[in-house]
Regions:
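Bacterial N-terminal signal peptides that target proteins for export
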Residues: 1-13
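Alpha-helical cap/lid subdomain in secreted, periplasmic
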Residues: 55, 65, 81-214
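Bacterial N-terminal signal peptides
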Residues: 11-21
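N-terminal helical cap/lid subdomain that shapes the substrate entry/recognition surface
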Residues: 76-80
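Serine-esterase "nucleophile elbow" of acetyl-processing enzymes
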Residues: 27-75, 85-93
C-alpha cells in the first residue's frame, strides 16, 4: 500500500514540476533524453518495462511531460567503452543527455585517472553539440579500499566542477547496499530499487529539461 501511495505522490510532485517546466520553457513537443551508461541504465536482469529508462519515461509521461528516454546503456561498459561509442549514440539527436558511467571501472580497479580522462573526453564531445547534461556520479565499492574510494569519488566531483553540467552525486543513492532493493547479485537494483532511483533523480531530470533550448 505504501509503495503504491508513494508512487502516486511522486507522480503528483513531478506533475506540478512538469507544469512549471512547460510554463518556463514552452516545450509542448516531445523531448528526447539520451540515457547513456552501463547496466544500471540498460536495466540488467529486469524486464524492459522495469528498467531505469522505461520507468523514468513512464513516470514523467504520467506527470504530463512529453519525454522519450533513449536507452543507450550497455551492460559491462566502462568509461573507455563509453568513449568508443558515444559518437554513434549521439546520432539519435537528443535534446538532453544523462551520463552515468564508471561503476565497472571501479569494480575492475581501473586507475581513477584513466576513468577521469575518458569521462572528460565524453563530456567534451557532449558539450560540443550544445545540449544540457546531467552527470551522475558513482562511488567505488568498499572492498576497493578507502584510498581508492576517495580518489575515485574525487573524479566525479572534479569533473562536475570543471564542466557545465547538472550534477547528481551518486546514481545509486539510497539503493546501494540495501538488500531488498537489489537483485540477488547485490549490485544491480531490482524493480523497486529502480523506482527509488527514479524518485530521487526525477527533480534533476526536470531541471535538465528546463535547460533544453526551444
Amino acid at each position: 500500500m505504501c509503495r503504491k501511495n508513494c508512487h502516486k505522490f511522486l507522480i503528483f510532485c513531478v506533475f506540478i514540476l512538469g507544469s512549471s517546466l512547460i510554463a518556463v520553457t514552452g516545450h509542448a513537443r516531445e523531448l528526447k533524453l539520451l540515457a547513456f551508461g552501463d547496466s544500471l541504465i540498460a536495466g540488467y536482469g529486469l524486464p524492459k518495462k522495469d528498467g531505469f529508462s522505461d520507468q523514468l519515461e513512464a513516470t514523467l509521461n504520467h506527470a504530463g511531460i512529453r519525454l522519450k528516454v533513449i536507452n543507450a546503456g550497455v551492460s559491462g561498459d566502462t568509461s573507455a567503452g563509453g568513449l568508443s561509442r558515444i559518437d554513434w549514440a549521439l546520432g539519435a539527436n537528443p535534446d538532453a543527455i544523462l551520463l552515468e558511467l564508471g561503476a565497472n571501472d571501479s569494480l575492475r580497479g581501473i586507475d581513477p585517472a584513466i576513468t577521469k580522462m575518458n569521462l572528460q573526453k565524453i563530456l567534451t564531445k557532449l558539450q560540443k553539440i550544445g545540449v544540457p547534461i546531467l552527470f551522475a556520479g558513482m562511488i567505488a565499492p568498499p572492498n576497493m579500499g578507502k584510498e581508492y574510494g576517495l580518489e575515485f569519488e574525487r573524479v566525479y566531483l572534479e569533473l562536475a566542477e570543471a564542466n557545465e553540467v547538472i550534477f547528481y552525486r551518486f546514481f545509486l543513492e539510497g539503493v546501494a547496499g540495501v538488500p531488498e532493493l537489489n537483485q540477488e547479485d547485490g549490485i544491480h537494483p531490482n524493480k523497486e530499487g529502480v523506482l527509488k532511483i527514479v524518485k530521487k533523480i526525477a527533480p534533476f531530470v526536470i531541471e535538465l529539461l528546463k535547460r533544453v533550448k526551444p
